[in-house]
Amino acid sequence: MSTPSSLQALVKKVLATQHISKEHYFILKYCGLWWHGAPIMLSTNENNQLMIKSAIFKDGLDLNLALMKAVQENNYDLIELFTEWGADITSSLITVNTEHTWNFCRELGAKILNEMDIVHIFYKIHRIKTSSNIILCHKLLSNKPLFQNIEGLKIIICCFLEKIPINFILNEITFNEMLTRYWYSMAIQYNLTEAIQYFYQRYSHFKDWRLICGLSFNNVSDLHDHIKKVDMNIDEMMYLACMRDSNFLTIFYCFVLGADINRAMVTAVKKFYTNNLFFCIDLGANAFEESLELAKQKNNDILAELLSFKDYYSSNASLLSLKTTDPEKINALLKNYKSKNIMRYKKLSRK
């Protein structure tokens, strides 16, 4: 049988999912569904993940992250409420800042954190990709001594950053800067506009980081918004766009601006990115001799065979007809893009 406390938590949970008119806000205040001068709301995202929303976290927080914020504020009613709604009370010990709150969380069941607990919590709290969530992750976890010497956490962040063509040496920056760049790059990867602006305004000294991440994560919209504010050679930008396979949007954008598509083709061969290679051919690249020689030097029989059918490949007129840097038009053009040259290769290679 449910206890009065659990029934009360359930009623509050149901109430928090309802649309409540302003004249009935007093009910929410009375029930403790009130945070920073506004109602607390519960919702789920497209992945059916539970989110906390409020006036200052309007696009949603992970429930565990909301708990960590309530702990930082020593808000005991919300600590208890979020725990009853399913937040992991152990995560509260990351942001606890008073002995009284520490004891309160321990009474609710919080366990002493070990390294694996911290890594697990780190993973959980940024599953929800919203501006509110990423910004609060940054605010709550920056300059935390608890995080400084956890090797597993450093490995996770370094592995993520190493996938981006970084313009610095990871071993020469602090862990806190690593973590900040991690959140900043995630904001760009998921095109979280508010979070991008937040990091851009506060970390302008991270030279070209926004541009590098936009190119790397195929975010043509943010690239278009930001490109006039930076000074970078267009071929260098194309090179950065080619550092991941299937980055069609940003490769096309750089191509329209005048980047050398033959150099992009050679880069695709060096990286063994066949999708980028065919896309470059579709855009008119014809550096077949150099590419074939490079493939042979690398003893890459797959690329050598692919390039041997050069006489059967041709550029894609529909791609070449659109000379625009408008992100919406580029997205529409490439939304269902499939290379006809790949289809030709597959037919020829089966003969």
UniProtKB/Swiss-Prot annotation:
It comes from the Viruses. Transmembrane segments: none annotated. GO terms for biological process: taxis. Coiled coil: none annotated. Plays a role in virus cell tropism, and may be required for efficient virus replication in macrophages. Belongs to the asfivirus MGF 360 family. This is Protein MGF 360-2L.
